[in-house]
Amino acid sequence: MIVSVVPINEEYVKSIECKTGERIHVYAGIKETMDVLPEAEIVIGFIKANIIEMCSSLKWLFILGAGVEMLPFALLEKKGITVTNVRGIHGPQIAELTIGMMIIFSRRLNQFMRNQGKGYVTYRVLR
């Protein structure tokens, strides 16, 4: 059984179900999942150590973020649970944002936009 403890876009759910042949049980939060978590083989979303303890069938924990440093790795290793996350999937977007911000600040476009909003007009040459 695949259980998501966080809401997921219905389009993504259908795509995953189609590719895996498994139904994904999506819940709005951890409280709603307490009855089904002991049977879950895959959990999507962050769960704490006390919840991991009660997941007797858990084989895979999929974290929808990059940060996993707060996970109880000793417990996960003892139970043989695989952990994956989404580290690195936004690399190109972050690089584009960084370049864009460098251009904005080097050319003082942020100041220009504030001045434009106030009705200021300057004819100074940008360097």
Features from the language model and the residues they span:
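An N-terminal-biased, well-structured beta-alpha scaffold segment characteristic
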Residues: 1-84
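Phosphate-binding beta-alpha-beta segment of Rossmann-like dinucleotide-binding domains, i.e.
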Residues: 81, 87-127
